[in-house]
């Protein structure tokens, strides 16, 4: 292990800081270019580094096999001895081998699972502050235990960060016996916890948490401890208040292990996370209703322009004139030009860009936002600038208070503050340059433990949505008749429920997982690998979902996955495909989509229109033409969203400078 890594884990070097975290740095364009280029080069050279890591894994396996002869008491004594050595020496290479060997043996005894060499390599990569690209189904949750215990035994807090509450509960509960054997306590941060329970969870040696919850708790700490003022003022405050960290949720940002790292660090990094407070709303229900009524009189292209990818609508000069004419005699907000135009633009967005059962659901007479990446409800989140209230009026729900921003931070800024950050994902190759340039994270591609037997049955792009669903139904019948389970992935609640209604009409028994039907998620996932089982799911059944096959299913061909709509990135598609053919099992997948899907409409509109109007095509596009059409749309989408993320970083840096000049933080 390098001297730099060894120094990073010496407890004494970190102890004096009341809230340890890395200082912000502002990289210039050259830094980002060099970081991106180096990241791509290092990924390409992954195989050159694997030889040394395989030697490390072999030593761990050899030492672990020797430990198998020890009794429980003797194994516990080894743990006690290891603690003393770690306190004296830090995480040397030899002690890392010892830790991993003990963890492997304890996992075998407590869980019935012993790490494969590729998982040991993955754990070592994460411990070194890098990303391990491990294919779906290769046991990333078990891999994360290795670096988590190694660092926690050294006396430093560890955050295991994942994408949803289901995975937090599953992994923390399943791994608890292993942590407890090492004398480590494990906490879970989940929604709806009271503050004291949440503080206790962060006070544990290892804390499992969802990325959004973690960042919001960090922002709360900064608000509560006045960390948004200058260093000098904080020092004075500590003299009078004592330890400013005593009531904080977190103990600092020591070591973070990010599961599904590309989702957290890339896909969800387009917009900042904001903490807000309620403010009195100058607009009432009548103003919102009036705005919704007025916008129905406006025509696309003449009075306003839609920028669907940006979720933005702008009034044209003709539209502004029209609104001014029809509301000139109205009182209040309608007399202020900027305010009335913003109100109309929000009404247009609520009507045309934010769709029920896609971007939100109405549950218990409340508008609840659906996370587009996880497919899950974010019940405590709201849209800003009056948009949420506009949608509430649109749906006939009770009006909630508007919100005022009091603290904000981007994912890019937050995760760069960890003293050490590592992670894992099955899909990092396409964004390795950005991960390296922004977060300083190198990616190492880890080979699979067994040969992958997942078959690609191809892509079919239909000209219309109805034809797509007909083809999906036929494929479901075929696979079910073979006695194989089938998982159909959709991108929205509405699409999943539409397919469910079609299946009911056909008399096909099935289960549904979406933001509205999530109470029995664990049971549905548990049964999804049974003979002839049909499961319809949004992205809730994507990342991290482990569908175990019933005995005999693999011999019939395994789980079959149908993707019914492409995502903006092929990485997200591959996550769904990866539910099949895990750990060497047989499996297959296919894509059955429509040119009317959002990806093609937004990012391949002209090409899609030419295809649809070309009589030489039949009702379906397959083969190389389908591959080219998909590739063109997804490349355009990825370039667009990459620019958005770069702009987010630059805007964040500019805002930070302005706030620093004013003596404030986030």
Curated annotation (Swiss-Prot):
Its EC number is 7.4.2.8. GO terms for cellular component: cell envelope Sec protein transport complex; cytosol; plasma membrane. Transmembrane segments: none annotated. SUPFAM superfamilies: P-loop containing nucleoside triphosphate hydrolases, Pre-protein crosslinking domain of SecA. InterPro entries: Helicase_ATP-bd, Helicase_C-like, P-loop_NTPase, SecA, SecA_CS, SecA_DEAD, SecA_motor_DEAD, SecA_preprotein_X-link_dom. Keywords: ATP-binding, Cell inner membrane, Cell membrane, Cytoplasm, Membrane, Nucleotide-binding, Protein transport, Translocase, Translocation, Transport. One of its GO terms (biological process) is protein import. The keyword Cytoplasm applies. It comes from the Bacteria. GO terms for molecular function: ATP binding; protein-exporting ATPase activity. Disulfide bonds: none annotated. CDD domains: DEXDc_SecA (cd17928), SF2_C_secA (cd18803). SMART domains: SecA_DEAD, SecA_PP_bind. It is found in: Cell inner membrane; Cytoplasm. ATP binds at residues 119, 137-141, 546. Belongs to the SecA family. Part of the Sec protein translocase complex. Interacts with the SecYEG preprotein conducting channel. Has a central role in coupling the hydrolysis of ATP to the transfer of proteins into and across the cell membrane, serving both as a receptor for the preprotein-SecB complex and as an ATP-driven molecular motor driving the stepwise translocation of polypeptide chains across the membrane. Monomer and homodimer. Part of the essential Sec protein translocation apparatus which comprises SecA, SecYEG and auxiliary proteins SecDF-YajC and YidC. This is Protein translocase subunit SecA 2. It comes from Nitrosospira multiformis (strain ATCC 25196 / NCIMB 11849 / C 71).
């Amino acid at each position: 292990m390098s001297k730099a890594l060894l120094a990073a884990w010496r407890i004494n070097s970190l102890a004096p800081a009341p809230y340890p975290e890395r200082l912000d740095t502002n990289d210039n364009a050259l830094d980002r270019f060099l970081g991106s280029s180096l990241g791509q080069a290092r990924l390409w050279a992954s195989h050159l580094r694997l030889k040394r890591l395989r030697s490390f894994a072999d030593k761990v396996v050899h030492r672990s096999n020797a430990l198998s002869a020890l009794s429980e008491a003797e194994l516990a004594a080894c743990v006690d001895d290891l603690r003393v050595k770690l306190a004296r020496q830090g995480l040397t290479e030899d002690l890392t081998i010892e830790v991993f060997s003990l963890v492997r043996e304890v996992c075998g005894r407590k869980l019935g699972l012993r790490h494969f060499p590729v998982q040991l390599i993955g754990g070592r990569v994460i411990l070194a502050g890098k990303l391990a690209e491990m294919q779906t189904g290769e046991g990333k949750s078990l891999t994360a235990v290795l670096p988590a215990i190694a660092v926690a035994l050294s006396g430093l807090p560890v955050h295991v960060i994942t994408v949803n509450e289901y995975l937090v509960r599953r992994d923390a509960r399943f791994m608890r016996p292993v942590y407890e054997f090492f004398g480590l306590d494990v906490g879970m941060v989940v929604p709806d916890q009271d503050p004291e329970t949440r503080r206790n969870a962060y006070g544990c040696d290892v804390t499992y948490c969802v990325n959004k919850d973690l960042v919001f708790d960090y922002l709360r700490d900064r608000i509560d401890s006045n960390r948004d003022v200058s260093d000098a003022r904080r020092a004075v405050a500590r003299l009078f208040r004592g330890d400013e960290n005593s009531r904080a949720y977190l103990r600092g940002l020591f070591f973070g292990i990010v599961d599904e790292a590309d989702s957290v660090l890339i896909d969800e990094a387009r917009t900042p996370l904001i903490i807000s407070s309620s403010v009195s709303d100058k607009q009432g229900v009548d103003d919102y209703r009036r705005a919704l009524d007025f916008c129905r009189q406006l025509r696309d292209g003449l009075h306003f322009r839609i920028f669907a990818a940006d979720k933005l609508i702008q009034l044209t000069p003709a539209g502004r004139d029209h609104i001014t004419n029809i509301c000139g005699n109205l009182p209040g907000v309608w007399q202020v030009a900027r305010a009335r135009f913003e109100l109309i633009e929000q009404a247009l967005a609520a009507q045309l860009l934010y769709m029920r059962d896609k971007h939100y659901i109405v549950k218990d007479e409340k508008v609840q936002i659906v996370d587009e990446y996880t497919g899950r409800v974010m019940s405590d989140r709201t849209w800003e600038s009056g948009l949420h209230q506009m949608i509430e009026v649109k749906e006939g729900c009770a009006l909630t208070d508007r919100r005022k921003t009091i603290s904000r931070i981007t994912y890019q800024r937050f995760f760069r503050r960890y003293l050490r950050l590592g992670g894992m994902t099955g899909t990092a190759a396409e964004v390795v340059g950005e991960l390296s340039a922004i977060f300083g994270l190198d990616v190492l591609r880890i080979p699979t433990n067994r040969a992958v037997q997942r078959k690609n049955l191809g892509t079919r792009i239909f000209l219309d949505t109805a034809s797509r669903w007909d083809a999906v139904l036929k494929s479901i019948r075929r696979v079910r008749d073979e006695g194989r389970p089938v998982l159909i992935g959709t991108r929205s609640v509405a699409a999943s429920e539409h397919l469910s209604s079609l299946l009911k009409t056909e008399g096909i028994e099935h289960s549904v997982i979406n933001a509205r039907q999530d109470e029995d998620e664990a049971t549905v996932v548990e049964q999804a690998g049974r003979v002839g089982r049909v499961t319809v799911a949004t992205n809730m059944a994507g990342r991290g979902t482990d569908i175990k096959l019933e005995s005999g299913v693999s011999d019939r061909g395994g789980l079959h996955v149908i993707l019914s709509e492409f995502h903006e990135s092929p990485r997200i598609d591959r996550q769904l495909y990866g539910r099949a053919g895990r750990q060497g099992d047989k499996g297959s997948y296919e894509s059955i989509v429509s040119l009317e899907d959002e990806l093609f409409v937004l990012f391949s509109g002209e090409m899609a229109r030419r295809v649809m109007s070309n009589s030489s095509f039949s009702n379906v596009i397959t083969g190389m033409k389908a591959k080219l059409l998909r590739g063109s749309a997804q490349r355009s989408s990825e370039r667009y969203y990459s620019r958005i993320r770069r702009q987010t970083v630059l805007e964040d840096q500019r805002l930070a400078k302005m706030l620093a000049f004013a003596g404030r933080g986030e």
